[in-house]
Structure formats: C-alpha cells, structure tokens
C-alpha cells in the first residue's frame, strides 16, 4: 500500500519536533561559543540562529567560588554545560543566578541543581513569591515532551522503512533523557534579592540589583567596579516587551547609557553591546509607549501599521530579525495599551 507523501512529511516533521525538543540533533551544544571578557568572566554566547529562542549564559569565577548566570532552555545543553564545568572550574560552583523567570533562563536550573546540589539559587523577590508557578512550568514542559514522544512513536509506522531505525534510535534516546529529567526538580531559591547585594567570590566581587524592566522581577549583575554589566534581557538589542514594565525599563536604559564606568554590556540574547547600541532598544521601547499614548483609539492592527518606520527599520536587516521584531512589536503594543 502506498503512503501519501503528505502523511510521510507530516510524520517526519513530528518526529523531528520531538527530537528537537529533546535536543538530540548533533552539534546543538557545540555551537555555543565561550568568550573571555576578562580573567574572571566568561560569556557563553548562544548560536545566532537561536538568539531569540534560547539564552546566553555567563560564568564568573573568583578564587573561592564560581557563579553561573542563567541556563539554557535546552536541557541537554545544560547537562553538557554541567559536565564541562567539572573540567573548567577551579573552584566550587556556589551560586546559580536567574536574571528573570522566563523558561529560557530559569527552568534549566533544575538540571544544574541536580549536578551541583550545593549551589544556591539566587532570584528576585518577585520570582521567589511566584516560584511554585515555575516549578509547575518545569513539569508541564516535561509533560509536553512526553506527549510528543508518544505521538512520534505512533507515527513511526508512516515513516519510510529505511528511515525507521534512525528515528527509533533517536526516540529511544529521547525517552531515556526524559526519564532522567523527570527525576530532577526545580528546588526553591536560597537567596532572595530585594535590594542591592554584593557577593564576594574570593578576591572578585559581583553586585546584584533587583530591577523591574523586562519583567517585574529582573536581576542585573555588575562586575569589575561597574565596568561590566550582565543585564539579561533588559539590555537585548531587540527587546521583548510583552511582560515589561516599560516606563521604568526606559529609565534604566537611560541610566546605563549615561554611566561613565560602563564599558561592556552582556545581554540575555545576542552579542555584547556598547552603550551607543543601547540607544536602539531604548528608541524601540520609547516609541511603543509614545505611539500607544498618542493613538489611543487605534486597534493593535492599526498601531502596527502606523508604527514609525524609522524605529523598526534597523531590525529589518535579516529575516530572523524581521520575524521577531514584528512579534515583539505586537507584544509591546499590547502591553503598553493595557497599561494606559
């Protein structure tokens, strides 16, 4: 009996989705690049094609302790990073800092906590307040993976016979990883930040500050006497405003732009920035709030069409930026409109 091409294509796509979700594709983790900012700070930059879907990490190490900022949403990548740290670190990993609650920054901490149970999770007080929601989000994500694997097994018969052994092996590995991740749990924070806090890693200090900008529970980290800022998604060149505190976010960006000490800015997504480059996200966020304020009677669709072209133009240099900027703009307009 001949299979319809559409059925085969659909089955292959679903199998690919299941395996992608469980990070089976080869070289997924290898594309993350390690960049030395200074002898104490390593910037783990996510590959460009995933820059709007997965996060960067930052490793900071003093003479007595190390601190990791954020984790990937790719649990297999987090496991690989945990293994790599065993080879790289000269000191214990004492702290795990989540810059905010979004999945691609927080949920992978469950994996890291399993490998480094003595490391203390550090979060904003607002994240701590709602932490049970994020623990549920971790289990929900695994439930989604499990359903995808089950459906993929059901559709395996529709895949060409010569392709089946390959996909069966991939799904077997996916199931093995899933069972392992189901044994992990996102453990409660041990350090909750509600005001400026300095952590001494041993001859090297980091300063953590609570913010309300990209979300209502952000953390920023500065090092090297304020010259290096690890700003999470607050300082992304193309920022996602859908959960943002837009006015205070703009104020904070202005503060960074005018900070004479600041020389290196590490975002949650994309490459390092200069203070001059921060003017673009500031312009984007400011235009969103002003556009909504000045056109209160317009629908979101109308606001999208009438949004200043000069502000959005820098984001139209490549397809991924265009797609993401349109989605982010819509989310920002909705956020600003709800705040009016």
What are these regions (language model features)?
Residues 205-259:
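Active-site-proximal loop/helix segments of hydrolase catalytic cores
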Residues 247-301:
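Divalent-metal (often Zn2+) His-rich catalytic cores of metallo-beta-lactamase-fold enzymes
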Residues 69-72, 94-102, 122-125, 210-211, ...:
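Active-site neighborhood of phospho(di)ester-bond hydrolases with catalytic His/Asp-centered motifs
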Residues 2-16:
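Bacterial N-terminal signal peptides that target proteins for export
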Residues 34-86, 219-233:
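Conserved beta-strand hairpin/beta-sheet module of binuclear metal-dependent hydrolase folds
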Residues 87-191, 198, 287-290:
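Active-site HxH/HxHxD metal-binding segment of metal-dependent hydrolases
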